[in-house]
Amino acid sequence: MIVGIIGVLLISVLASPAGAQGYSSREPAEPSDSYWKKFALGAGVSLLAHESAHILTSIALGFHPYIGFDKGRPTVYSGIDSQRYPHKQFLFSAAGLTTQALINEAILDIPHSRGGAIERGILAGGIGTTLFYITIGRNGDVSDIAFMARTSSLSKTQLSLIFGGVSAIHAVRIWRNPAYSHFFVGPTENGLGIGFQF
């Protein structure tokens, strides 16, 4: 609950500058370099919200989270004994993806000027993280999906369908909204540019 409130507050704060991020076809498009930097910033904000949700949930439940490494990858550990407190571990594991879904939902629902690069990055960060966790990241030693499956009656497949379904709905809503045209595809002088360019 606390994480959800923090997520809504975060969106309220981020919604204020969204007016300056809006894209109008009458205005010149942002330079490509600036656009991708802002997009990456938005994706970083989404990932920071994901990890912060884990930390805040653990603290709210009365535990002491810590950051460590799993096979060289930085990882937030709950500090919760999952054998003794499986429900609390489930809440910790679900907090990151749930917060990102709530942030994406708020962006898509709260009226504001839409389509800025930072906003697109936040949306892509939420969808991308979910896509990672429901595919190649679902079987990792410290995978959120794997921990949720171990600490609940839901299987990895069921959890993947739940979180993947929400992100799929977000993707469809983005695809249907003209403010998000060219979300990952943009016109170039030679046709279409797909994905990222380095």
Give the role of each language-model region.
Residues 8, 38-42, 46, 100, ...:
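Hydrophobic alpha-helical membrane-embedded or membrane-associated segments
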Residues 30-47, 85-90:
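Short pre-active-site segment immediately N-terminal to the catalytic Zn-binding motif
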Residues 46-59, 96:
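Active-site recognition of the HExxH zinc-binding catalytic motif
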Residues 49-50, 103-107, 145:
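Extracytoplasmic/secreted envelope proteins and their assembly/folding machinery
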Residues 53, 80-88:
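Short juxtamembrane and helix-loop transition motifs at transmembrane-helix boundaries
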Residues 77, 91-109, 118-135:
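Small-polar-interrupted transmembrane alpha-helices in polytopic inner-membrane proteins
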Residues 87-103, 151-163:
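Membrane-interface loop-to-helix entry segments
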